[in-house]
Design a protein with these regions (language model features):
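Bacterial N-terminal signal peptides
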Residues: 53-63
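Bacterial N-terminal signal peptides that target proteins for export
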Residues: 44-54
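...with weaker cross-activation on analogous glycine-rich loops/strands in unrelated enzymes
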Residues: 263-327, 333, 364
């Protein structure tokens, strides 16, 4: 089956007259109505056959496309973001609510293929991400990505340039905790590759090799709190999980991720992890770095419902994301006193001493997604 400029073949060697010829014959056939009808019927037959052929071609193309997608989906079991921050939605549509986000270089497990891919992030959250915003990988490709030398962005924002020159065009923006493959170093730039193969250069003052970073990253309360406070002023965004914007649990999740620790994504999940602490009236049994939870208190007929979380920083103060990331206080004498949150305070969870002792609080060098 083929097509050229003059003839459309329904079968090999059986041409049907082209439309221009038929139109000319119809226009010039003035001898009789019978001749006009014959030409008219020939045109109808031609157009009908053309439509049949078009439908057949579309069906074949669709089948080939679907087969290719199925074959790729059968082998591609991982998805890695190719933009600095990728939105993950509750449904396969732009209008669906944003549930969470993933960072460039972060491994995600594919649950369902399609134009919108259903994925699971390292913290166990699931949702739909647009196919074009990720690089799908096979098990072998995912292993290669994880095993390769990588750099991790260590400043809030940075740029990957097309050349080792800050005046060259931008390849991509990146944010804290984005990961890129390390290809080499040229003067004061790391030569890097994004998951989709694009290459560029990032200033060495904006990133560190993962190997060196892991030697110095700390999981103590002082370090976690310092990072949390460094995010003060970031805007609140539902589903936000990056240094561009965060919701309450996304703030906690991001703060810990900057220290290479993966926590559950949502406040209701975080409230079940670690050592449970019923908070003393004078807050004396809280320690800096504890997670403090807020929401609806339990009643005789309803259990407590967690809807907010923050990080306790000591002296009856906590840092959290509500409208924006800021510090609030449980002390009525403090200028930062937060009566609203004090009235809905529920309990605390202690997680820092339990890093790598329970599966829900794990450094990424031991996480299955990063070590696959």
């Amino acid at each position: 089956m083929c097509y050229d400029k003059k003839y459309l073949y329904l079968q090999a060697d059986k041409p049907v007259a082209d439309t221009i010829t038929l139109q000319r014959q119809f226009k010039d056939s003035t001898k009789s109505k019978t001749q006009q009808y014959k030409v008219y019927n020939t045109m109808n037959t031609f157009l009908r056959n053309t439509r049949i052929l078009a439908v057949a071609l579309l069906s074949i193309v669709g089948a080939i496309s679907a087969t290719a997608q199925t074959q790729e989906g059968d082998t591609a079991t991982w998805a890695v973001p190719v933009a600095s921050v990728v939105n993950i939605r509750g449904g396969a549509d732009y209008s669906a609510e944003m549930e969470t986000q993933a960072l460039l270089g972060m491994p995600m497990k594919i649950i369902e293929n399609g134009r919108w891919i259903k994925v699971m992030t390292p913290d166990g959250d699931t949702g739909y991400v647009l196919e074009s915003s990720v690089k799908r990988m096979t098990d072998a490709e995912m292993h290669e990505w994880n095993a390769a030398k990588q750099i991790i962005v260590s400043t809030h924002t940075a740029t990957v340039y097309a050349q080792p020159d800050a005046k060259s065009p931008r390849v991509s923006d990146v944010v804290t905790a984005c990961r890129l493959k390390l290809l080499g170093r040229i003067n004061s730039f790391f030569h890097v590759a994004l998951p989709d193969g694009r290459e560029g250069y990032i200033p060495t003052v904006r990133a560190r090799t993962v190997e060196n970073w892991r030697k110095t990253v700390k999981h103590d309360a002082e370090s976690i709190i310092a990072t949390g406070l460094s995010l003060c002023g970031l805007p609140y965004q539902w589903g936000g999980t990056s240094v561009k914007a965060v919701d309450c649990s996304g703030f906690v999740r991001t703060t810990f991720l900057i220290h290479d620790v993966t926590l559950p994504r949502n406040a209701s999940q975080q409230a079940k992890v670690g050592q449970h602490i019923d908070i003393a009236p004078d807050f004396s049994n809280l320690e800096p770095g504890d997670l403090v939870f807020f929401g609806r208190k339990a009643t005789d007929d309803k259990p407590a419902h967690v809807s907010h979380v923050g990080i306790y920083i000591g002296n009856k103060k906590f840092v959290h994301s509500l409208a924006w990331v800021h510090v609030s206080s449980f002390d009525p004498a403090d200028p930062e006193y937060d009566e609203y949150d004090l009235n809905r305070l529920l309990w605390a969870q202690r997680v820092l001493p339990l890093v790598n002792t329970i599966p829900e609080v794990t450094t990424n060098d031991r996480h299955a997604f990063y070590t696959h």
